[in-house]
Amino acid sequence: MGWWLFPILGYFIGSIPFSYLIPKWLKGIDVRKVGSGNVGATNAIRTTGPVVGGICLLLDALKGFFPVFIATTFSGDPKLVSLTAIATVLGHDFPIFMKFKGGKGVASTLGIIFCLSWPTGIVFTLTWLVIVMLTKYASLGSLVALYISALLGYLFKGYDTGMLILILAVLSTLRHSENIQRLLNGTERKVNLFKR
């Protein structure tokens, strides 16, 4: 199997827009036209509720997990695994099936983190939950959890894993630029995890 097939597979799997498809199929809601308009799990949770949004979150995480799992299983080369992970998140962020307008990569990155270091994935999840429950700001929870995960990935698994998660954190930060501005202005949208 050619090395280049792994990142290509990752990109196309990452491009599957579960956070658009699931709300559309189950609730008839186009997430591009409601809430923040973002094709991601947070907007799905905000606009369709915790059940449908939770399904989107799980599927978006799994599409991050599996390409990296495949690359790790059949290659194991850290550089190829990293390239596959980055390609997968870029697929989520810029999906070919949605005219390159996608999400912000958090759920897919979470799946990648669980694949590389499940203890780090658990810490990410708990950090995100605590911050979002306290502040109602999913973007804040995501960014804090990502950078904590980069440090833990380095401590638990070494330089390659820590650096990969850091790169993915930076990519997500760039995708969250408008959210960061709204957080600073006090106008960021809030999300309630337990009700629509």
UniProtKB/Swiss-Prot annotation:
Its EC number is 2.3.1.275. It is found in: Cell inner membrane. Keywords: Cell inner membrane, Cell membrane, Lipid biosynthesis, Lipid metabolism, Membrane, Phospholipid biosynthesis, Phospholipid metabolism, Transferase, Transmembrane, Transmembrane helix. GO terms for biological process: phospholipid biosynthetic process. GO terms for cellular component: plasma membrane. It is a multi-pass membrane protein. It catalyses: an acyl phosphate + sn-glycerol 3-phosphate = a 1-acyl-sn-glycero-3-phosphate + phosphate. GO terms for molecular function: acyl-phosphate glycerol-3-phosphate acyltransferase activity. InterPro entries: G3P_acylTferase_PlsY. Its main location: membrane. PANTHER family: GLYCEROL-3-PHOSPHATE ACYLTRANSFERASE-RELATED, INNER MEMBRANE PROTEIN YGIH. Catalyzes the transfer of an acyl group from acyl-phosphate (acyl-PO(4)) to glycerol-3-phosphate (G3P) to form lysophosphatidic acid (LPA). This enzyme utilizes acyl-phosphate as fatty acyl donor, but not acyl-CoA or acyl-ACP. This is Glycerol-3-phosphate acyltransferase. It comes from Thermotoga petrophila (strain ATCC BAA-488 / DSM 13995 / JCM 10881 / RKU-1). The lineage of its organism: Bacteria, Thermotogati, Thermotogota, Thermotogae, Thermotogales.
